[in-house]
Amino acid sequence: MRLSWVLTVLSICLSALVTATGTEGKRKLQIGVKKRVDHCPIKSRKGDVLHMHYTGKLEDGTEFDSSLPQNQPFVFSLGTGQVIKGWDQGLLGMCEGEKRKLVIPSELGYGERGAPPKIPGGATLVFEVELLKIERRSEL
């Protein structure tokens, strides 16, 4: 009887531990609006071509990439897999002129492989982004 009770308690503790680590291991995308715009006639959606300025850093503040030194915006189609998943999700519903800070967990960035040599495997990425222009597919 006593052994049965001990095994039950151990089983419950083990289940709680597995559940806790399972949810803790999966971090979510964090989106912070740094600058809002007063007039927003169009918001970014899947399929739009976005013109962005960005600076990417690791959690420790080490910068790994930026469009600012070249003064050349990065242009891509949103929601089509041209960029990391954290961008495809974190840039939806943005207005021209808006600035956001994205904290992207590894699973939505470069994963366990990373992007050597600048981005190690499992890295959380921090991006400061500014949406300069939206081109709607129907306007192309």
From Swiss-Prot:
Top-tier EC class: isomerase
Biological process according to GO: chaperone-mediated protein folding
Domain PPIase FKBP-type: from-to ranges: 47-135
PROSITE patterns assigned to the protein according to its UniProt record, in alphabetical order: FKBP_PPIASE (PS50059)
Superkingdom as given in the UniProt entry: Eukaryota
Reported regulation of activity: Inhibited by both FK506 and rapamycin.
InterPro entries in the record: FKBP2/11, PPIase_dom_sf, PPIase_FKBP_dom
Signal peptide residue numbers: 1-20
Catalytic activity: [protein]-peptidylproline (omega=180) = [protein]-peptidylproline (omega=0)
Keywords for the protein's UniProt record, in alphabetical order: Endoplasmic reticulum, Isomerase, Membrane, Rotamase, Signal
Membrane topology: Peripheral membrane protein
Pfam family, one: FKBP_C
Record-listed E.C. numbers: 5.2.1.8
Alphabetical list of SUPFAM superfamilies matching this protein: FKBP-like (SSF54534)
Subcellular location(s) of the protein: Endoplasmic reticulum membrane
Record GO cellular component, one term: endoplasmic reticulum
GO MF annotation terms: peptidyl-prolyl cis-trans isomerase activity
Subunit structure: Interacts with ARFGEF1/BIG1 and the C-terminal of EPB41L2.
Family statement drawn from the similarity comment of this UniProt entry: Belongs to the FKBP-type PPIase family. FKBP2 subfamily.
UniProt function note: PPIases accelerate the folding of proteins. It catalyzes the cis-trans isomerization of proline imidic peptide bonds in oligopeptides.
Protein's name according to its UniProt entry: Peptidyl-prolyl cis-trans isomerase FKBP2
Gene source species: Bos taurus
